[in-house]
Amino acid sequence: MPRHIVCLTFDFDTMSGFIARGLTTPTALSRGEFGARASTRILAFLQSRGIRSTWFTPGFTIETYPGECEAVVKAGHEIAHHSWAHVPPANQSREQEEADMERATRPSGASLATGRAAIARRRGI
């Protein structure tokens, strides 16, 4: 039987996208809460099938839902950079984008690898 390789990713945005667009009513924010609730179900499904994945997670989500994000890592999955609060970089100045990258990286406790991004080198992160 042929072997297939698949890259499975999730955008674990929770309510960050709503906040980035200024949608901070209880209704908008409640829609963003489902991602954190669903993460437990997704992790159980992935574990039952022995599947590993990458979760693109904004820093806001890591700070707001640390337990859920820790569960992702403990289950053997990767958390990847996904900005601070899902603000499109095209709408940011260079300085705003740099500040967003730095702010998004800190909650994870990670540092960006040398040479990976010019912004990281300039900022010393």
What are these regions (language model features)?
Residues 1-118, 122-125:
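Catalytic alpha-helical scaffold of carbohydrate-active enzymes acting on polysaccharides/glycoconjugates
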